[in-house]
Amino acid sequence: SDLRATKGAIDAFRAMGKQCKDVSNGLPTFISPWIDGKKAIMGTGKLTREDAVSVQQHEKEWNEIFDGIHEVVDACAFQDGHIDYDELDAFFSVNKKLADRYGMQCWTNAESFDRDMPINFLPIKFDKLRMKLEAAKRAGYDKAITFEFSHFMSPQSAYLQAGHLYDRYREYFEIK
């Protein structure tokens, strides 16, 4: 397989993972990369792009990366915001399969802001966040984290919608 596309990522993740392991006496490490999907459009002025990575290409690239880093990276929490909602199950099941293959944990990094709006960025509607979390659950993910709680989900946020999103999240998960 042609490693040129992934070699830089492997070298960087392996070096950082090893350094973290060395300075922490072997504590667990995780990475949270993006998926190069149709919403990976920073700086283009568009809402989507045509040349997004396919599920098959994603699987090939991340199989190579995980093969090169699994000894020093314990978990991977892919950011979910660059792929479309109808692609969640396909990408998430591949991510989980690869993590399992290499003995890594598979987490989701559920973005709590909305990329589908012309205004960058507003808190996401709860139904969209719920869809992403439910897809992670269907795929058998180990944990969920979010980016970025303090701006887009905290009751203390300047965005009124953030407090509402937090309330809906607590209701859904029956958190008192």
Positions of predicted regions on the chain:
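Glycan-processing catalytic domains of CAZymes
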Residues: S1-K176
